[in-house]
Amino acid sequence: MASQQMSTNNAQMSAQQAAVLQQTQAQQLSQQQDFDPVHRFKMLIPPLKDSLQNVMTIASLNFAHNTAIDNGLKTTEKGNDAAVQRFDKSLEEFYALCDQLELCLRLAHECLSQSIDSTKHSPNLVPTATKPDTVQTESLSYSQYLSMIKSQISCAKDIHNALLECSKKIAGKGQGACN
C-alpha cells in the first residue's frame, strides 16, 4: 500500500516537473520569437492586409460620397460628413505598419550580415554545453577560441594605433603623407 502511494506520488511529481519544464520552454520560445525579426514580420502581415482592406473600403466610401455630392444627390451638411470615415487616419495606420515591416526587414538583413561576417571571421564554433550529444567536428576548444579572440583584439589595437600615429603625423606636418 505504501509503495503504491509512493509510486503515485513520484508519478505526480514527475508529471508536474514535466509540465513546468514544458511551460518554461514555451516561454523561452515565445521570448525568442518576440525578438526574431522574421517572426515579427510574419505576425505583422495579417494586420497589414486588414489595414489595406480598411484603407480601400474607406476610400471607396469617400469616393462614392463625394460622387453623390458632385451629382447633386447629397448636400454638404455637417451631419452628413460625420458619417464618412477619415481616410487620412486609416492611411496613417497603414503607413505605420509598413514602417514596422521595413524595420523588421532591415533588422533581419543586419542579423544576416552579422552572421555571415561572424562565419567568415570565425568559421569554427565553440562547442556548447547545452547539446552534449552532438559532436561538432570542426569546433574549437575554449582555449583556442580565446587565443583567436586575443589575436583579433591585438590586430584591432594595432590598426587603431596606426591610425592614431597617421593622424598625428598629418596634424603635425599639415599636409604630409602617412607611411
From Swiss-Prot:
This chain belongs to which protein, by name? Mediator of RNA polymerase II transcription subunit 29
What GO molecular function terms would the record report?
transcription coregulator activity
GO cellular component terms, semicolon-separated? mediator complex
Q: Which gene encodes it?
A: med29
Q: Which InterPro entries match?
A: Mediator_Med29_met (IPR021018)
A Pfam family that this protein carries is: Med29
Annotated function: Component of the Mediator complex, a coactivator involved in the regulated transcription of nearly all RNA polymerase II-dependent genes. Mediator functions as a bridge to convey information from gene-specific regulatory proteins to the basal RNA polymerase II transcription machinery. Mediator is recruited to promoters by direct interactions with regulatory proteins and serves as a scaffold for the assembly of a functional preinitiation complex with RNA polymerase II and the general transcription factors.
Entry's localization field? Nucleus
Which species is this UniProt entry from? Danio rerio (Zebrafish)
